[in-house]
């Protein structure tokens, strides 16, 4: 049984969030975010996913990922640095899209955790590769 969310430290909250994402447990991942949490993705104004997202638009992104990657999109955490409520994560994703194309991207996340919930998440990634595999039409 998992400890209550508020008893988890910032690193444990972040690791649990990305474990949920990797396992396709998107509702569980969203539950680890504060109700007013924001996510910012690099590339605002330059591709459809760039910019700020609330929980509703993040849910739409999760639905799109589930549709495009029916066998899941695995996220592997390579390194974590924690300073107070700030958690920096280096990670890599891997997934095979429904049409057989492979998506593998590198990320840096900067995450703020307060009271056991993620309040702010900033995502840096290769936006060209992400747009091609996440947003462009499938073959």
Which ranges hold each PLM region?
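Short, low-complexity N-terminal intrinsically disordered segments enriched in polar/charged residues
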Residues: 1-32, 138-139
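Hydrophobic pocket/interface hotspot
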Residues: 14-17, 29-30, 37, 58, ...
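A generic alpha-helix structural signal
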Residues: 14, 18, 59-65, 134
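A beta-strand edge to alpha-helix "cap/lid" segment located at domain peripheries
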Residues: 1-6, 63-139
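A solvent-exposed, acidic/Ser-Thr-rich amphipathic alpha-helical stretch
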Residues: 34-83
């Amino acid at each position: 049984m998992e400890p209550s969310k508020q008893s988890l430290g910032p690193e444990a909250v972040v690791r649990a969030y990305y474990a949920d994402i990797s396992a396709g447990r998107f509702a569980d991942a969203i539950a680890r975010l504060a109700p007013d949490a924001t996510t910012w993705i690099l590339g605002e104004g330059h591709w459809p996913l760039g910019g700020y997202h609330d929980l509703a638009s993040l849910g739409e992104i999760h639905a799109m990922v589930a549709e495009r990657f029916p066998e899941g999109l695995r996220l592997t955490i390579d390194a974590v640095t924690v300073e107070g409520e700030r958690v920096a994560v280096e990670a890599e994703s891997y997934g095979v899209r429904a049409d057989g194309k492979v998506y593998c991207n590198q990320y840096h996340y900067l995450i703020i955790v307060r009271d056991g919930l993620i309040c702010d998440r900033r995502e840096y990634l290769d936006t060209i590769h992400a747009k091609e595999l996440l947003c462009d039409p499938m073959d």
